Amino acid sequence: MPFVVVSLSLHASILEHMDALSQHYPGQSGVYILEKGEESLLTRAWLTESAQKTIDVQYFIWSTDNIGTLASEALLSAAERGVRVRVIVDDLLIDADPETLLSLDAHPNIQIKIYNPLHSVGRGTLSQLWHLITDFRDANQRMHDKVVIYDQTIAITGGRNMADEYYDYDHTYNFRDRDVMVAGSVLPRIQEGFNSFWQHPLSVSLTELLAEEKRDLTTEQVGSYTEWLHRYASDPLNFAPEIRIAITNMATRVEQIFTQLHWTEVDYLHDIPGKNKQRNNLGGGGQTTASLIELLSRAEKEVLIESPYLIMPEGGYDFFSGLLSKGVKVAIVTNSLASTDNLQAYSGYHKQKQKLLDLGISIYEFKPNPGIHRQLIDRYEQLGKTSPIFALHAKSLVIDGQITYIGTFNFDPRSANLNTEVGVVIDDSKIAHQVAQAIRRDMQPENSWDASVDIDQQGVGFLKRLQVDLWSLLPLDPIL
């Protein structure tokens, strides 16, 4: 079906845009792949500015760096114009202080909840250690979801958290990642997934976690922080020059994105809060794991996988051996030792790599200085800057040139058994071709080493290799 062009206005609601489009595609969902970090960031910014009723946010990481701070201000501005904002953030890596969190939560249109708060918010060091010792499994069960829903009409999900390095704005280290924007018939299921977390006891309100700090928080402190936040966002020095230009042109770019939505069949996968919490061990899987296994088991010709971490969980070898024995080609691109941000996870992969290669899986290891950076962030060359190094962070899967998964699931035991995960499954050859082309490009020699022939640990110093060897001695595989 040809694209339907709808004229957009910054002052019209997202809901109006999508109503005008979706009536032409009953029962289908619009899909747009967000490959570039800058485009994904600016699309989020525009949608946040345009939302009129609700914004629901679910993240594993929300940093206090430049991007995280600007995003917080954007949500505050939305709340100030009457938008209801609900935020769920996993507790593990929160680095904001209680006053900052409570000052945002103090706005009547903003509610913040913390998922499984056993580590950071409202916990002292002794409490953290106690929970880690006495409740090891629950302390390791994290919400890895990354979803933003605007006016219950448009959603973005994928690999990106809210921090500089996920949007190509860290000056030294960035992630090669992938998101997808969806609209249409899949939205009720995405909203249902968010609501299941929002209503669950594992998601605890800030006012409950920080009751004492809230009592001590003054109106002046709240006002001082919100004023500072608005000043920060309005200061052009806090935006790179290229971002200021991009923001100016964003209305035109978003109009192009909306007209390029591809309408097709889309499903949404999400785990329940706590995942397999009823189990007593570190295994057992979840709904996302089971769905991906079922999709993979139907493969007949080819499976392409992109995952920053590659550690086979229990049963993984036999499963992929079965695929390969029936003639399915399996190719995976993951991080090299030179590019990885997680030495513990790499140590698990390092122990398994030869066995995976012996099975017949083609493995490619992403380079820290891939040629693809020129396509992803060409502004560095334009501005005469030195490009930062890259690590792979995209989590995608293409089966038989027809089925595509884009989401948060890493191919490791932690995603399979511990962390809650989400993602969309798209049954469409055009989208599959687009994502497969991107994955194959990441596998090219200018972007990745062939793990079967290239020198292992190429260009990596002794200390980093030693760290991997030491991590490999520990029995950590179930939680990697």
Residue ranges and their predicted role:
Residues 5-146, 150-480:
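Charged, low-complexity intrinsically disordered terminal segments
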Residues 1-2:
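Sec-dependent signal peptide recognition
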